[in-house]
């Protein structure tokens, strides 16, 4: 439900969890500016500081103060042209010498400089973080742009007018800077980028385009110094397209050795039906869909995955998932949801063996095939609830209050390994108590309840996690982008992060006991201790010590299920709990796992790096506030995917839009949004009959239509293809 006033402003949105109302209220001032948004939890506990978004405005209607739930206020100052020139958040205000972020613009309103200063004065000791250049290339004669790769002919400079041509970006905690240059062609397409890296080298990327402006060739050269010797890595991508401009083949050349990285085949409906890796020698992936264009099956020699959908008021959520990885046995999850589409139960089965041709895959007697409705033959069942995960209670903002997780407790035994009760202060986690006495066998994935006290978790003024006593973390420090700078453990072990001022992660250093390891990220090349370790490709990675190709076999969410070599040999198998924990995996040769994100397990950290935030899969929460939380008002800014990790993935940056005909579309932010479409949000509740609703969420491009064809529900899942 959405309620509006006489001026068409939304004053209430209501989502129904069966008969329970989840209400979000919107309050405006006399000038029509939004002043308060009261989350559903506010209706139970009227605390503005914990459960309200708050805004203040000046006489010109510009927001001068903003408060997110559980965070200190952010202050904004504008110039006469209504441009933001200063901002200050809670962490900047809490420093001994208060800091402000400042912004400078050119006469066209383009950001030219951003940094920090000590007060709102042009002479207040500014520290420049980002300096942008436009229209020309005079800057390449300055400091930092001395390499010949930055030099352009007069003809090459001619097409930079109207575009950003370069940047100088500071590196937090390092005296070095990133010097970046863009070169354009006559159509305004970037044909060359040059930037330096932390290893005294450069990353140079040159691109040619097809007539329809799709990349045709991409040549990337990475140079670096290793033990004082200059070395280089050169890779080339060649893209081939079919008549509909869909990628049909991707070739990859690494230092003059060419392979066919992938080949795609599509059916007459435009659906991807086959995908071969490494010229089909690594794997051939087949894809099947139902009449609604939803993905139902992925099948290859090393990964089989089947999805069944429920057709109740849940709106087509995934009801069960079968899979088989490598030579291992079949497994199944059966999912149930509450009225808001949040996961309640993910019941796990290890299935008995069954004929490969039986499409219904070993389900116990009494269950009905979701697709056919017929009775399924009984088959041997090896184990129930081996790796079940259940959320037994949410609050009205979607925060998990109780979670039960099953796992392996012995060589041949399984049981409850986590029986968690979360205590919150507002949306912030304060304490976790584990009632289970069993532990995961062999040091497997589980929550470690190391202490039992109040305030096990602490936060700074911006809502960033600064203490996790259950992991032995006594302090977490952040840079001005709310990205971690230092994680300090009780035993004085540390993890130090190096970021550029634009948020790019450049280096991570682990000091654990007497051991120090350093990982450096230079574009898609990863270095360990200054030695090139691997090169990430569109389908996996190349290990640079032996120049061998490795390929990820992904499921519908982009989770890396199986790692194979160029000959199809299985090198790693990963199985996941719904919220991302890794269980019962074979080998562990690389860190990219759930959603394809990097997992850091050192010192028991167990964080997934999602770029803007770190994610703790044991608790199903992020460590910092969602930077886009104002687009998801009813939901806690810490929860993962609104409590639905089955049908959603967080990093897609997608939302619901409504067109002029009243149809709802799922579209990428920044993508092709048609004229007349209006933003709805991450979810939409539609009345299908009196007092009955269908809630649609971030789970793909379903289109509630009048008379037009449906979009693919799995569209957002396939953004990684």
Question: Whereabouts are the PLM-identified features?
Answer:
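Beta-turn initiation residues at beta-strand->coil junctions
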Residues: 2, 6, 12-18, 24-26, ...
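Short, small/polar residue-rich loop motifs at catalytic or cofactor-binding pockets
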Residues: 20-22, 49-51, 70-72, 97-99, ...
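Extended repeat-based solenoid scaffolds, especially LRR ectodomains
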Residues: 1-4, 123-185, 291, 305-314, ...
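Short turn/helix-capping motifs enriched in Asx and small/polar residues
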Residues: 567-582, 603, 611-613, 617-687, ...
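A motif-centric feature for acidic-aromatic and gly/ser/thr-rich catalytic loops and repeats
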Residues: 36, 42, 211, 305, ...
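Repeat-solenoid scaffold signature
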Residues: 64-126, 242-296, 321-409, 476-510, ...
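A residue-level detector for well-ordered beta-strand positions
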Residues: 2, 26, 55, 76, ...
